[in-house]
């Protein structure tokens, strides 16, 4: 069996220590499906602040990041998952509102 995690981008801040000290240090593959909150039209204002930092934090951690805007972007999912498990590294897949609304 293989693991993955589903979370909102606001959880990135509280998972940094675990990502660095466990996942990356021990070469544990971990696909992260992340609902990307805080873009234009976000109804909850506090979500916007974390959206400003999400991609920069993932970049600083050297975690490959993919951003799904439309359903057709999910065609890349198998390749992304295979890369995570082959390379034994975490990957982040950001999914914005357009993706979930079927754009």
Task: Give the residues covered by each predicted segment.
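Glycine/aspartate-rich loop-and-adjacent alpha/beta segment that forms the canonical ThDP
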Residues: 13-15, 87-103
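Fold-independent oxyanion-binding glycine-rich loops
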Residues: 7-9, 34-36, 61, 68-71, ...
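Residue-level signal for alpha-helix termini/capping positions
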Residues: 24, 85-86
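Conserved thiamine diphosphate
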Residues: 46-80, 86
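Hydrophobic/aromatic beta-strand patches that form the interior of the parallel beta-sheet core
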Residues: 4, 31, 66, 91-93
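Active-site-proximal loop->helix
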Residues: 15-26, 41-60
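Thiamine diphosphate
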Residues: 1-37
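Short, well-ordered, mixed-charge alpha-helical segments that flank or form enzyme active sites
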Residues: 14, 39-43, 74-77, 100-103
